[in-house]
Amino acid sequence: MAIVKCKPTSPGRRFVVKVVNQELHKGAPHAPLLEKKSKTGGRNNNGRITTRHIGGGHKQHYRLVDFRRNDKDGITATVERIEYDPNRTAHIALLLYADGERRYIIAPKGVSAGDQLIAGALAPIKPGNALQLRNIPVGSTVHGIELKPGKGAQIARSAGASAQLIAREGVYVTLRLRSGEMRKVLSECRATLGEVSNSEHSLRSLGKAGAKRWRGVRPTVRGVAMNPVDHPHGGGEGRTSGGRHPVSPWGFPTKGAKTRGNKRTDKMIVRRRK
């Protein structure tokens, strides 16, 4: 991958920083693994906005990604190509299994076209192979981690994400996540070795507001720029600071307030995130 800083040939190009990957497939995606993806504009079935800042954007197809990798144990797969996926920050890899089936997976870092991957208890320890956590050596870097056996990957799926397996005790293993959180996960759960591809994603700069609109993201208006009827920070004569600690449009504390309320899984967290 290469970081390309564009020349300022126009105001919209002046601040553009691209991540260029020559290995990405330039043709169409694999059609049998595509599904229709409808735009909602952030509205529900009543036409009311339920999620702000959503609307417009380029038409997209959803790529069916295999997050489980539990029904092809022992079957070797060849990486046909690495592709761009508009639905996620990571790249995806198209696998051709020895039995003739093709599937998409999250592309691990360092995996390229022509590589051989395999899942199952007897899989060798190398990036891209999927095993149960009990079969992965302590100290290994993993991604695409399940929280429940057979449910599919839920942790460490975005670009550059990973976790480290730091301990094994009884039926649990302990993982250190990128956030600093240390968490216990059942050793029966699966994970993929290595870290997720496209780790340079955070270095890019879109350069202009229109590039956000192409991605379906609408503008965010500050509360202090609104009227009192629209936001708790609204109104006042001239420019104001809002007059109170930052809150959402509905009056809930924002900017750092704790929102986690899942007490059921608190026992699985060994150390909270930093």
From Swiss-Prot:
- Give the protein's recorded name: Large ribosomal subunit protein uL2
Described function: One of the primary rRNA binding proteins. Required for association of the 30S and 50S subunits to form the 70S ribosome, for tRNA binding and peptide bond formation. It has been suggested to have peptidyltransferase activity; this is somewhat controversial. Makes several contacts with the 16S rRNA in the 70S ribosome.
Q: Where is the composition biased (Basic and acidic residues)?
A: 263-274
Q: What does the sequence similarity comment in the record state about its family? A: Belongs to the universal ribosomal protein uL2 family.
An example Gene Ontology biological process: cytoplasmic translation
Q: Which GO terms describe its molecular function?
A: rRNA binding; structural constituent of ribosome; transferase activity
Q: How does it assemble?
A: Part of the 50S ribosomal subunit. Forms a bridge to the 30S subunit in the 70S ribosome.
Keyword Ribosomal protein assigned to the entry: answer is: yes
Residues covered by region (Disordered):
28-54, 224-274
The UniProt gene name for this protein comes to: rplB
Q: Check the record and name the Pfam families matching this protein.
A: Ribosomal_L2 (PF00181), Ribosomal_L2_C (PF03947)
Q: Which PANTHER family match?
A: LARGE RIBOSOMAL SUBUNIT PROTEIN UL2M, RIBOSOMAL PROTEIN L2
Coiled coil ranges (UniProt) are none
Q: Which GO terms describe its cellular component?
A: large ribosomal subunit
Organism of this sequence: Pseudomonas syringae pv. tomato (strain ATCC BAA-871 / DC3000)
**What keywords would UniProt list here?**
Ribonucleoprotein, Ribosomal protein, RNA-binding, rRNA-binding
